[in-house]
Design a protein with these regions (language model features):
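Short coil/turn motif common to extracellular beta-sandwich-like domains
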Residues: 35-39, 154-162, 256-263, 932-946
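Aromatic-rich carbohydrate-binding modules that target alpha-glucans
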Residues: 56-109, 179-204, 255, 263-311, ...
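Basic K/R-rich, polyanion-interacting modules in nucleoproteins and related proteins
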Residues: 232-274, 334-392
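Substrate-binding/active-site clefts of carbohydrate-active enzymes
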Residues: 361, 376-551, 559-578, 588-597, ...
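Conserved alpha/beta catalytic core and glycan-binding cleft of carbohydrate-active enzymes
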Residues: 551, 584-729, 733, 780, ...
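C-terminal beta-strand-rich structural cap/linker in extracellular carbohydrate-active enzymes
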Residues: 853-875
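Extracellular calcium-associated, cysteine-rich motifs in secreted modular proteins
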Residues: 874-925
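Proline- and Ser/Thr-rich low-complexity, intrinsically disordered segments
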Residues: 879, 888, 892, 920-965
Length: 965
């Protein structure tokens, strides 16, 4: 049914949806039988809408043509699956039935309807609040098509196609080409006629070119009672083998300096011939629209000419297979799998013109999806060479554009740039933007990975947002779901298993891209076989496109456990264990990303075993690379925020605990896929202390500050989910109306209280935002966080974690030590500080200086944290005149021996010393003085040192250079 086409992902992504299908219903229609131009009344009985928590019932309907092929219409009479149109509301009758009256040709705006599909549903059908599909045949007399069983049908050049129809009534049959009658059979229950190919030696109706023949079937007693059957007969073309003028890549190939011409290439193994149908050729199959075959690689290609650079063009492929595998169609119409923009009969009617102005209308009398050739309005980038933030410094802000602001658009993000800047985050991660099925989605149900989904805005609007982020020092990371696709993908449809011929199905056994059954246990959609060269080529083209076209700074690879061929959909142990094939494969994808952009961020959502994850985290780490790994810490940090010691050990937020050689762990407390911290604080928090009840909103919000300190100040990359910085308490299971709906509403669009209630001005929420902003700024700007650290969790009280941070490479009057301690208990705690040095420490959040000994004791209020920093005072003495106070100088006497190794400190200038810093020879003190007067490029071979030497009678000046020549 149509709902499966539009919102198939709802039934796949959420595995625990509670079924609410009402099976025991009965359908009827009046009159029965009926023609498509008659007004009919459809009724359903045995339905109890109270099981769906509603009193109202809506009809959801779709239709098929006279050849029993489902029609994809650009007219949307139903509305959305989660929001049916009021015009489709059924009437509740006194006998308990529900009914709906309509004229099929008027509702569907289509003539020649052969069958109507119906179901009844709640206005929001999410969670299977519906009845099963039911079908009504259209027509006042019965007809059975005996052959051909498929439509269109291929007519081989020397072959024939038999058109055979039968009825229980005597019928007048007229086989017609347009208005011309080619053959008639009167007063018969059956009709049969052979149609011959152009090279056939038999006599009869011979076709030279492809054509649609119409069989008019009339009631012999009522000429107004008739049915038209259409048969699309495609004459097999003569094959054309021809090399293209230059090497093409799959998809659209533009010609430099010639906007009037493009080349298209499609790789379609096991297909026999392909037509390109578009608005540039009026969608007509002809020799001019037939693709050539490149004899060097067997790929299909075509040259398209006479294009106007100021117009939009679109096309789709009509792909033919003379001998498809059992259950697969002879012909499919698909958009280009390498499309950059799609125009769709399924989704486009519900896309706001505010977000996507000048959206081309879907072409009349066409179906499916088309590739838009968009050469208009090229974007001019302001930032050409963005310097990415260091991996160690990343604070990533994860966003679902749909739920960020009311307009659900890229423009919303642009308008909120000051919000991002003031929070001081330096990276934004956008959940998938690739063309996905439906409009309101998380985006993981992708069908075209190179195509931008139009629901959020135009290509240029996304580029404008990325450009603006780069202008403000913010990197943009894109979530990439490349372990699977969904059913509208051309890569599925060209080789699909479609035994009921309804134009939908999973991969057939000849599909070169997909496994028929998933090779891992977390599969949704259809599982890519990434050991296949075609899949690897497709994946690399996706990576190349988003890096080069959109200047994307990094990818978060979704569900990398799915990149293996070694397991099956039922073996969790296999999926979760080390798999060498995916280790090697994903390294190769990382290598390819780095070949395009050496500083590209590669992030894996693997959530697997340490022995596998460290293979990636440590990969090419000596080159400054290494793959960053998602580190889910939700339940552990949530236990802390709720005030419970059990299962609250956050020591795994330390990259060293996982065997990583450097800081490549993206630890997080919240992500798009987890229950919200604040929701659990308010509903399940520790309420044992009435003076500090975590279920109290003010207290729960206050504790979010400590959570920020304990997570974000751990050195290395970190991630936050949007609006956790203001304590968003809506559950992940919140419905669009703000109610709690369980799994049914996990994927639902969320309300926007952060803007409608202006949270940025509310004291407590503003405090969290400003607090997090301070510690994020500290984390990003202070080089101490690029040093070493120890995350300490004490077995006797896990609610008091500490982070000890230092950087021995720092010198001078700078922040060299940071000490973070938190109290997640619900009572005040007296704590012993384990500071590395005694002296003056600074409260880095409140800007207060405090004197501490190394083992000072402090009292920390419940749900709070203290962030201390030690700035070294280098003193006013500078014995060797190098500009570094003696306290901080590694070589105070300037004899070339570090203080730590100098057994003879304060050696006089002019002395020659041994390895222990003790003098071997010194100029006489009474009449000699040697000093360094200048130095340049210290530590390099082309520097110089100027010396001044004085005695009682003479002054000397010597310059010593280190130049190689």
């Amino acid at each position: 049914m149509k709902k499966l086409v539009l919102l198939f992902f709802f039934t796949l992504i959420s595995s625990s949806i509670i079924a609410q299908v009402q099976d025991n219903v009965t359908w009827s229609t009046s009159p029965n039988p009926f023609n498509d131009s008659e007004k009919i009344k459809i009724s359903v009985s045995g339905l109890d809408p109270s099981k769906w928590s509603t009193d109202d019932v809506y009809l959801w309907t779709w239709f098929f043509d006279s050849n029993d092929v489902e029609v994809s219409s650009q007219i949307n009479w139903n509305g959305e699956w989660n929001n049916s149109k009021e015009s489709m509301k059924m009437t509740k009758n006194s006998d308990g039935t529900f009914s709906f009256e309509f004229t099929p040709t008027e509702l569907f705006q289509y003539e020649g309807i052969g069958k109507i599909g119906v179901l009844a549903k709640a206005k929001d059908g999410t969670g299977d609040k519906k009845t099963p599909d039911y079908f009504f045949e259209v027509g006042r007399f019965d007809l059975t098509i005996n052959s051909p069983k498929i439509n269109p049908v291929i007519l081989e050049r020397e072959g024939s196609v038999n058109i055979s129809v039968s009825s229980t009534n005597e019928i007048n049959y007229y086989l017609m080409n347009g208005d011309q009658v080619l053959f008639e059979s009167l007063n018969n229950k059956t009709f049969s006629k052979d149609i011959l190919g152009p090279d056939s030696e038999n006599d009869g109706i011979k076709l030279i070119e492809s054509i649609t023949l119409r069989l008019l079937c009339k009631d012999i007693n009522d000429s107004n009672n008739f049915i038209n059957l259409n048969f699309d007969i495609v004459v097999e073309p003569s094959s054309i083998e021809k090399e293209p003028p230059f090497e093409l890549h799959d998809g659209v190939n533009y010609v430099n300096g010639d906007d009037s011409k493009i080349y298209l290439q499609l790789n379609a193994p096991n297909k026999d011939f392909i037509y390109v149908l578009g608005n540039f050729n009026q969608y007509i199959k002809s020799n001019e629209s037939l693709m050539n075959v490149n004899p060097l690689n067997n790929k299909f290609w075509i040259e398209i000419n006479d294009l106007n650079e100021n117009e939009n063009y679109w096309y789709q492929y009509e792909v033919f297979s003379k001998s498809p595998v059992s259950g697969s169609p002879t012909v499919v119409k698909v958009a280009d799998p390498f499309s950059n923009v799609i125009i769709s009969s399924y989704d486009d009617t519900n896309i706001s013109l505010d977000s996507y102005p000048n959206l081309p209308k879907f072409p009349k009398n066409q179906s499916g999806e088309f590739t838009l050739i968009n050469q208009l309005d090229k974007y001019n980038w302001n930032v050409l060479n963005f310097e990415k933030p260091k991996k160690d410094d990343l604070i990533i802000y994860e966003i679902l554009v749909r739920d960020f602001d009311n307009e659900r658009s890229f423009q919303n993000l642009i308008d909120r740039i000051e919000y991002f800047k003031n929070l001081n985050i330096n990276a934004i991660e956008l959940m998938p933007l690739m063309e996905f099925e439906g409009n309101e989605s998380w985006g993981y149900n992708s069908s075209y990975h190179l195509s931008l989904d139009k629901f959020y805005g135009t290509q240029n609007k996304l580029k404008e947002f990325i450009d603006l982020c780069h202008e403000n020092g913010i990197a943009v990371i894109l979530d990439l779901a490349l372990n699977h696709v969904f059913g509208r993908s051309p890569l599925v449809k060209m080789w699909m298993d479609d035994p009921d011929n309804n134009s939908w199905g999973g991969p057939s056994n000849e599909n070169p891209y997909f496994n028929q059954s998933a090779k891992h246990t977390y599969s949704v959609g259809y599982d890519f076989n990434h050991q296949n060269e075609l899949t690897q080529y497709y994946t690399k083209r996706v990576v190349e496109h988003w890096i080069n076209e959109y200047k994307i700074d990094g990818f978060r690879w979704d569900l990398t456990k799915g990149f293996t061929q070694n397991c099956d959909e039922n073996n969790y142990d296999c999926t979760n264990s080390f798999q060498q094939d995916r280790v090697d494969l994903l390294k190769s994808y990382a290598d390819y990303s780095w070949s395009l952009d050496p500083d590209h961020y590669v992030i894996f959502e693997h959530l697997g075993s340490d022995n596998e994850e460290k293979e990636w985290a440590n990969y090419r780490i000596d080159e400054g690379k290494g793959i960053m790994m998602w580190g889910k810490m939700t339940s552990l940090f949530n236990q802390l925020s709720m005030g419970f010691s059990d299962n609250s050990d956050i020591s795994r937020a330390d990259h060293k605990s996982r065997g990583f050689n450097d800081k490549r762990l993206v630890a997080y407390a919240e992500s798009h896929d987890e229950e919200r911290i604040m929701y659990k604080n308010l509903n399940f928090g520790n309420s044992s202390n009435s003076n500090h009840d975590v279920k109290n909103l003010e207290i729960a919000l206050e504790r979010m500050k400590a959570l920020g300190s304990s997570l974000l100040l751990i050195p290395g990359p970190k991630m936050i989910w949007h609006f956790s910085e203001m304590g968003m308490e809506n559950s992940i299971f919140t419905c669009e109306d703000g109610s709690y709906g369980g799994e049914d509403c996990k994927l639902s669009t969320k309300p926007q209280p952060q803007w409608s209630d202006d949270w940025t001005l509310l004291n407590k929420r503003k405090e969290i935002y400003e607090y997090w902003s301070k510690i994020i700024e500290l984390k990003i700007n202070e080089p101490v966080f690029e040093g070493e650290y120890e995350l300490k969790v004490f077995n006797q009280n896990k609610l008091l974690p500490t982070i000890d941070i230092w950087n021995d490479n720092l010198s001078g009057d700078t922040l060299k030590y940071v000490y973070v301690i938190s109290n997640f208990d619900v009572t005040k705690k007296s704590l012993i500080l384990d500071l590395p040095i005694s002296g003056e420490w600074k409260d880095l959040v409140n800007n207060e200086f405090i004197d501490f000994s190394q083992n000072s004791s402090i009292e920390l209020e419940p749900g709070t944290s203290l962030v201390l920093g030690n700035y070294l005072d280098c003193g006013s003495f500078d014995s060797d005149g190098d500009g570094i106070g003696d306290v901080c100088d590694d070589d105070v006497d300037g004899d070339g021996i570090l203080n730590t190794d100098d057994n003879c400190p304060n050696t006089l200038a002019g002395s020659t010393v041994d390895l222990n810093g003790c003098e071997i020879f010194t100029l006489p003190l009474d009449n000699n003085k040697v000093s360094v007067t200048s130095a340049s490029c210290i530590g390099n071979t082309d520097g110089s040192i100027g010396l001044s030497i004085e005695d009682a009678s003479y002054a000397y000046s010597v310059t010593v250079t280190g130049k190689d020549d």
